[in-house]
Amino acid sequence: MIVFGWAVFLASRSLGQGLLLTLEEHIAHLLGTTGATATMGNSCICRDDSGAEDNVDTHQQQAENSTVPTADSRSQPRDPVRPPRRGRGPHEPRRKKQNVDGLVLDTLAVIRTLVDNDQEPPYSMITLHEMAETDEGWLDVVQSLIRVIPLEDPLGPAVITLLLDECPLPTKDALQKLTEILNLNGEVACQDSGHPAKHRNTSAVLGCLAEKLAGPASIGLLSPGILEYLLQCLKLQSHPTVMLFALIALEKFAQTSENKLTISESSISDRLVTLELWADDPDYLKRQVGFCAQWSLDNLFLKEGRQLTYEKVDLNNIRAMLNSNDVSEYLKISPHGLEARCDASSFESVRCTFCVDTGVWYYEVTVVTSGVMQIGWATRDSKFLNHEGYGIGDDEYSCAYDGCRQLIWYNARSKPHVHPCWKEGDTVGFLLDLNEKQMIFFLNGNQLPPEKQVFSSTVSGFFAAASFMSYQQCEFNFGARPFKYPPSMKFSTFNDYAFLTAEEKIILPRHRRLALLKQVSIRENCCSLCCDEVADTQLKPCGHSDLCMDCALQLETCPLCRKEIVSRIRQISHIS
């Protein structure tokens, strides 16, 4: 939701600026004077005007800051959470160039309040984005993110990703200048070990840039010094959070094949074998490191002679798990199918393998990270739009609990709940009562009032489901283990009634999945969407006929020409 709202705002801002500039040109033409732009100074936000403000000397800025506000502005205080209006109205003072560190901390302070797509980003985010449009400004923003984001804030790394992901792409010169300023190497990684926030933030910035600049720019960014720095951060002497984000940065650099080869040749797998032993550690920070180390060994940095985790994990008692075939593209799922993590900049979602239609059902989630996750219930009709920022609770077919922002989500609208913010190790309970048509959420056994709004759209076909913001992780219990806080009413568990074959329980690493896909033989006349059924359906009025009837019934527009589908005609009879 946050990312999508920010992107919509940027698009509308650019359009608005263009219209304002066009209007100025017409006024200048009509008045026949070059002073037309100056007469519109209180409403125009063009780049020239912003630049002029940035060059105002310090004494003038101090003088303006000391100006007594008008009576109107004093009588109408602005909501501190609501961002200011764009442009400068009659009651809004001229903008000042603020301290970059202050803007970053302001963004971190209000990030929890960004919940609706139609909500403007805060003034601090807008200003930082404008500053980053120049190389010098972009470098100032990046250095500030490294310098001031505190270690203890659970949303700190997510704010780094959010701000950098929406800033303009850096130029080659800016990247070169950044590497010179940071001057990273193994020795730097050993410095300031008592202040791990700087190293955590540096690794988070590098990971975000590697993800954003995949390709030649990413190859150029991974210099020998930066590689040495990240590898040094993986040593056991480092703070666990530094180890975690150094590993995530290496994962993102490895999205480019040349970088993956370079990193693999550094014997990184030997270090990860030790770190994967932390996957079940009671320290939740170390547990994150262990999860990512195990995932990297299974998916990216393979070690010769090491058995892949899915080949040795015991799944005998597990009958319901997260569905690796019903998940958005960047979510990481553990080999036992009960733990998930997102390290991408998108909002990743997953449903479980078991669907319920009647009765009373309950499952629990252990919070491993205390950031933004939306966890609850969803039907098959609930859509995963990870790049647009939509997940569980963002349509009429799902409802979700958000313990970080203390919200209940339904149909992309939120309302506050009275539970405190969740923290690492908390247990969240999810009760679905299809007899009474209600959902009840629990935090460490304390329940909220029932939620019923989702039943106005659907009354059956519910799955346990969750969506994850960047760097978030949790573990699910569908009944394979005793519950920590079972509700007092009688209920059923997925694990008691579900069934999975041995093959359905396997969660293959990505390289194994790709290898299997290469072996798949696709028939000439198969559906172009599912590739399973025969393409036997013609769409009207466009006439395209590359789909089966099952897929055609799920579409409103033709995937080839985007024309609206009025009718569907089955052309041939066949045996599937």
UniProtKB/Swiss-Prot annotation:
It is found in: Secreted. Residues 58-73 have a biased composition (Polar residues). Induction: Up-regulated in response to denervation-induced skeletal muscle atrophy. Induced by MYOD1. Glycans are attached at N65. Pfam families: SPRY, zf-C3HC4_3. Residues 300-483 form the B30.2/SPRY domain. InterPro entries: ARM-type_fold (IPR016024), B30.2/SPRY (IPR001870), B30.2/SPRY_sf (IPR043136), ConA-like_dom_sf (IPR013320), RNF123/RSPRY1-like (IPR045129), SPRY_dom (IPR003877), SPRY_RSPRY1 (IPR035774), Znf_RING (IPR001841). Its main location: secreted. A zinc finger (RING-type) spans 527-562. The modification Phosphoserine is found at S50. Residues 53-99 are annotated as: Disordered. Expressed in embryonic bone during primary endochondral ossification. Strong localization is observed in the perichondrium and periostium (at protein level). Also expressed in embryonic and postnatal brain and craniofacial tissues. Expressed in skeletal muscles. Residues 83-97 have a biased composition (Basic residues). CDD domains: RING-HC_RSPRY1, SPRY_RING. The keyword Phosphoprotein applies. GO terms for molecular function: ubiquitin-protein transferase activity; zinc ion binding. GO terms for cellular component: extracellular region. Residues 1-16 form the signal peptide. Keywords: Glycoprotein, Metal-binding, Phosphoprotein, Secreted, Signal, Zinc, Zinc-finger. PANTHER family: RING FINGER AND SPRY DOMAIN-CONTAINING PROTEIN 1, RING FINGER AND SRY DOMAIN-CONTAINING. This is RING finger and SPRY domain-containing protein 1. It comes from Mus musculus. The gene is Rspry1.
